[in-house]
């Protein structure tokens, strides 16, 4: 596996995402100012696609491995992992009747499947992070999901709008007790908060 090629792919896609997401740009500037940078705090990245296996292929060919499948009412996701890199969350609508109500196909037709829908950054104190980012003009969609003291707490920024359509969001993720997974009810709630409605 070529780590240099994977680094280049991840750097290019994250840079493209940050350019098109105001919340991520604000956070990156804050982190760059301290010398931390954006890349070291990335928890996971998410691609929306019409075919999960094809969407994940560029990452799988560079060493990512399938870990788990998460299922929801009208969409599902596969999680891929590679030690030393952010988790990769790839989602799509079900290809049958169940997927008819999913927002994913419309998003993919508008924006493609070679861009990140969102990047999640790891935070130590999600409430404090929300307050500081709000002070710098970031708007959040909905409320923090997940119980205080629970394994995983998350929130999405309000989506960047392109031609009236929600494009990308920034996710803040607070994790505890070594938990690296995803909680389906929370992920579905976040998905719904990313519609811009």
Regions found by a protein language model. Give the residues of each.
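The feature marks the first
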Residues: 24-53, 62-65
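Flexible internal linker/loop segments at domain or repeat junctions
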Residues: 87, 93-113
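Vicinal oxygen chelate
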Residues: 1-36, 40-50, 70-91, 104-197
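Amphipathic alpha-helical segments
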Residues: 50-66, 128-137
